[in-house]
Structure formats: structure tokens, C-alpha cells
Amino acid sequence: MSTLLLVEAFYGGSHKQLMDLIKEEVEGCILYTLPAKKWHWRARTAALYFMQAILPSDTYRVLFTSSVLNLAELVALRPDLGKLKKILYFHENQLIYPVQKSQERDFQYGYNQILSCLVADTVVFNSAFNMESFLTSIKTFLKKIPDHRPKNLEEIIRPKCRVLYFPINFPDIRQYLPEHKCIPHNLVDKSSSDISYCPKTSIQTGRMSVEFSDHQIQCSIDESSAEQEKTTVSEKNNCEGVDHVILHSQSTLAGDIHQEKPLHIVWPHRWEHDKDPETFFKVLLKLKEKELTFHLSVLGETFTDVPDIFSEARITLGSSVLHWGYLASKDDYLQALCMADVVVSTAKHEFFGVAMLEAVHCGCYPLCPKSLVYPEIFPAVYLYSSPEQLLRKLEDFCKRPDIVRRHRFQGETERFSWAALRGEFRSLLDAEPREDL
């Protein structure tokens, strides 16, 4: 039996999600990993570690790895692995990583990724933005070499490149959804193949490809409000919160969130410089200065160096904070997302955005920069052009949180699901017969 060799030098976050999903869904996998710590050292030295860790086998046919690993080093150190079909997956690229000063950019990381592309058989990117920003930056990036620069590398690498969106295994969130996020069944196209139901109330929820305007939603809600009032008391929504409390109050976690409750903003990103937490918290502090009421959940993983703004903001925002810190339990994390109204990104470095799409799946209204990958993923209504525009949108939502709670996402998340992408991934990972094996 042929074996799919999975190698992940930074086994955490979306890197871990992808490897775990492939291992679970594709037969004949063997996985080698390094913990998601000290990213810079993983990028520098992982190949040497895997040279010794990966056991030799005649069954290997495909090697799948992320661009954290220097694939060129690994196949040079292990010629037996060089004979495999080598697939390199880019979650991010280092050629356009944001640094505060040009002198801070470490040339080696981007250079390693270019070398890895040259030895790979197939190079896969999680978005068109990721692919184009990488390929079109190669020439400029290599100008940092003082002389004798290599030529035409974009032309050499491009033919082996393709886009294959990150596959999200969207979970069943019905037990966590508050009532206002459950959609009356008469508003949903029943032909949609991606609709789930709250069993006790015949209310449909989940990822929808159907689009409704705010006006359509409001009219339908007004027409059915009397009937809903009759059923609300006698039939408890099956999407109410569970007993385990992760926020400050049981009332906040309960499924029956009334429209007058303060806007709940969630920030579910890594606590690092490239996610630009400074801009996010500056906007929230301005909301505070305007004496606007809101609740806040700051989630996401933390690593060795946490920006100072987090400790400062925690104190300043005080009673507005409902949850602060990483949630190791996926169920707790999904529960927190389901209780939020708006999910915000202020990223300066984003090539897909799993956290944003997961939050949208949980019924959050997304607000994203009009740059990076976001225009590729989200309709224009969810994009902002400046911190000032983000502030204005959040200010409006704080004054009228009911507008957000009535809104239904106007985009489509299903195309990013494992169900939609499974076939492409299986085809990608199929071994190609080789005479030299």
C-alpha cells in the first residue's frame, strides 16, 4: 500500500488543522511534526531534524508539507524523499511579511521558500492573493542579493503553482446558537444542500448560499413576529448555551439574547504584531471615549512575545471584557463565537483567514480590511478602507446592535468547506506512478 508522508514543521493553528484533516480523511497517511513553538527556529532547522526523524520506507509515494519547512534542505539530506511526488502548501509567504523597518526583514525565510518551490513538484497556495503576492514579489525580493542574482525564477516556479483554498471542516454549532441567529424556515431556500435545523423549533441554521438583504429579513421577521412570540415560551430553542460558563455571566451565554443587549465584538486572532492589535484596540478605546457600550471577547493563541498593547487594553477596557485569552477547547471557542455579534480583523498579514470564516459560520458579522486576501473571500459590504471607517461602522453597530443581529451573511462559505474541496485534495494527493521507485 502506498503511503502519504505528511511533514509539518509548525504543528499548530491552521497548519495543524490541515494535517489532522488530511490524516483523518485520506487513507495511508503517516505524520511527522514539530510543536508550534519558536517559528523562526523551525524554519531554520526543521529539515535537519526530519532527516533523522522520518523513518525510511519503500511505501512512500507522496510528500506533503507546508512552506515553513525548507524542502530543498530535506530532499538534499534525504535523497530517498527527493524521488517522491513533493507537494508544498503555502499557508503564508514570507516575501511580503510586514516589518516595521526594512532592515528587520530576515532574507533567509523568503529565500528558503523560493528554494522549496524550485524542488517541489506542485506548489499549492491557500488563496489567489497568496500565490500572486508571492510570485510577483520574487524579482524584487532577490534584488537584496548584492550581485550575481538568479534570473527568471518566477517563470520557472509559476507553471507548478495552483490555488486550493484551505478546507474548513465546519462543525455543527446548533447547540450553541442563540435564538436570534436561527433563521425562520420560510426565509430559506429549501433546495440548499447545506442547511441544518434546530430540531425543537423547525428553525434552519448554518452555512447558507442564499442571500437576503436587511430589508427582506426585517419584513419577514415583522410578518412572523406574532407567531414566534407564541412559540418562544412553550418551545425552548435547542440552540441555547450549554451549562459550562466561559464568560462572566450565565445570562450572557444563554441562547435567548435580546436585541437590546450591548454589541458583542470578538477578535479571534493570534496575539502578534502582524495581526495589528494596536489598531483594533485604538478603535475600541475611541468607542469608550464616545461612551458607547459594547462587550468584548479577545481570543486567539499567544506565543513567546505578546505585544504590550494587550495588557494595556485589558486594564483600560475593564468591564467591557467578557472573555480574554486562548480557549484550548474547540467547543468553548465555538460557543464564544456563537455568542458574539461582530468579528473584526485588523490584520496586516493575512492570506486566508480561517478564524474569520469560522466566526461567520457561527453567525458573526465580519469587518475586514479592504486589502490582503479579504476582497477575495468577503463581499464588499464587509470591507473597510481605514481605521476611521471601521470606527464609524462599529459606532453605528453599538448604537443599533439589532441591525447586526438581523443581518444574514451575503457571501458563501460552503466553497471553503472540506465537503466542497475534498475531491480536489484527494486528486492532489494521489500518487503518480514512477518507474524509479
Swiss-Prot record:
Protein name: tRNA-queuosine alpha-mannosyltransferase
Catalytically driven reaction(s): queuosine(34) in tRNA(Asp) + GDP-alpha-D-mannose = O-4''-alpha-D-mannosylqueuosine(34) in tRNA(Asp) + GDP + H(+)
Gene Ontology biological process terms, A to Z: regulation of translation; tRNA modification
Gene Ontology MF term list: tRNA-queuosine(34) beta-mannosyltransferase activity
GO cellular component labels: cytoplasm; nucleus
EC code: 2.4.1.110
High-level lineage: Eukaryota, Metazoa, Chordata, Craniata, Vertebrata
Location (main, coarse): cytoplasm
Purpose: Glycosyltransferase that specifically catalyzes mannosylation of cytoplasmic tRNA(Asp) modified with queuosine at position 34 (queuosine(34)). Mannosylates the cyclopentene moiety of queuosine(34) in tRNA(Asp) to form mannosyl-queuosine(34). Mannosylation of queuosine(34) in tRNA(Asp) is required to slow-down elongation at cognate codons, GAC and GAU, thereby regulating protein translation.
Organism field: Xenopus laevis (African clawed frog)
Domain of life: Eukaryota
Recorded family membership: Belongs to the glycosyltransferase group 1 family. Glycosyltransferase 4 subfamily.
Enzyme class: transferase
InterPro entries with a match to the protein in the record: Glyco_trans_1, GT-like_domain_containing_1, QTMAN_N
UniProtKB keywords: Cytoplasm, Glycosyltransferase, Nucleus, Transferase
Localization annotation: Cytoplasm; Nucleus
